[in-house]
Amino acid sequence: MKKTHITEQKFADLGLNPQVVEGLEKKGFEFCTPIQALALPVLLSGQDIAGQAQTGTGKTLAFLTATFNHLLTTPAHEGRQPTQPRAIIMAPTRELAIQIYNDAEPLIASTGIKAALAYGGESYDKQLTKLQGGVDVLIGTTGRIIDFYKQRVFNLNNIQAVVLDEADRMFDLGFIKDIRFLFRRMPAPQERLNMLFSATLSYRVQELAFEHMHNPEHVVVEPEQKTGHRIQEELFYPSNEDKMALLQTLIEEEWPDRAIIFANTKYKCESIWAHLAADGHRVGLLTGDVPQKKREKILEQFTQGSVDLLVATDVAARGLHIPQVTHVFNYDLPDDCEDYVHRIGRTGRAGASGHSISFACEDYAINLPAIEEYIEHTIPVSDYDSSALIQDLPAPVRTPSARNQQRRTNTGGARSGDRKSNNRRPRQPRQHKEA
């Protein structure tokens, strides 16, 4: 697959440590995205940064590159023990922490830098063993990091680089006290390289930067519109009775390679999953009640393509780096305007195009005016013909066993006017290799 770049700035021309450049090249990264092109020269000069960029524009690679380069070009503190981290990367959710770790591993494979994870919902002993084996870069959620700190597994006296990712989300989830607890146990701000990245640089985020960073430079990559010009947005006004049939019909028409379907409640997500599973779709469910191991497995299946549809609450809307999501369905319009932007930001990433389809139903249409005011444009409306919707929906299931039911072969077309109808053959069942 051809990689798309958005600037002409090459990583190799930034003066990075050769080992960092080698890691980037092995992963196919040659050109910078705008946030990388703006942030990296500042960070390489030793200046702290508070960066704002639209979701999916490469913030993670920017701070990982800067962190690894700083560790490779700056001597460790004299007397530091191998179990004492030199850099710490804080994330609001365990899913994001895992994604950052997975992105980091191939970049440091040949550098000698050791990364370790610390997050809740996973074996304490397993993570402890990893930390006791030595750690340079600690990646995790604040709660588990504090747990290990209070158990004296490590101290923060040798921290030379700090990353706070999704800072606005940290506030939303109530983690600011934890963040301040950790900052106050590190060396003074001027003795470390500090990086804060956020989808928005609100007043409270800027205040946090002022308190715990050393004269950070603000770097902002302002999108042409908040939702991204590569995302095709579409809005329907279904009745509550038509919503499920409309969703299934649009899925049959669009035939997305990889789609996320968002709903506002765990109960609604479970209901959507049950209907789609009954109809033979390869669908996963991601809510706050799903155990961590299962969540990781579902995300792995979705990323690798053995699951085509992911039904999720907003737990999946922020921070997860899932490549090549072609469609996002807002089954429910979110109550928070920013969540709309973060949801549809799962598609149209890194130069690719994407399609967002939203339902303004009887329950959530009230949220639309505030969303459109926030994104500063109206969402194009499409009509649908209720008589063209799928009528023979099977009864929802509660277990994955019914996923093998045979798919229907023709659904007609739900959209009115000149919109395309579904004339594609049904997707062939996935071929399983024989043992």
From Swiss-Prot:
Group of enzyme by EC: hydrolase
Region described as Disordered: spans on this chain: 395-435
Residue ranges constituting the Helicase ATP-binding domain according to the UniProt record: 40-219
Pfam families (UniProt xref): DEAD, Helicase_C
Biased composition (Basic residues): 422-435
Cell compartment(s), UniProt: Cytoplasm
EC number from the UniProt entry: 3.6.4.13
Binding, ATP: A53, Q54, T55, G56, T57, G58, K59, T60
Molecular function terms, GO-annotated: ATP binding; ATP hydrolysis activity; RNA binding; RNA helicase activity
GO BP: RNA catabolic process
UniProt keyword list: ATP-binding, Cytoplasm, Helicase, Hydrolase, Nucleotide-binding, RNA-binding
Domain of life: Bacteria
Reaction equations catalysed: ATP + H2O = ADP + phosphate + H(+)
Any coiled-coil regions, as ranges: none
Short motif Q motif, span: 9-37
Motif (DEAD box): 165-168
Keyword Nucleotide-binding: yes
PROSITE patterns (alphabetical): DEAD_ATP_HELICASE, HELICASE_ATP_BIND_1, HELICASE_CTER, Q_MOTIF
Domain (Helicase C-terminal) ranges: 245-390
Cellular component aspect of the GO annotation: cytosol
Entry keyword annotation includes Hydrolase: yes
Biased composition range(s): Polar residues: 401-413
Subunit structure, interactors included: Component of the RNA degradosome, which is a multiprotein complex involved in RNA processing and mRNA degradation.
Known role: DEAD-box RNA helicase involved in RNA degradation. Has RNA-dependent ATPase activity and unwinds double-stranded RNA.
Listed name of the protein: ATP-dependent RNA helicase RhlB
Originating species: Vibrio vulnificus (strain CMCP6)
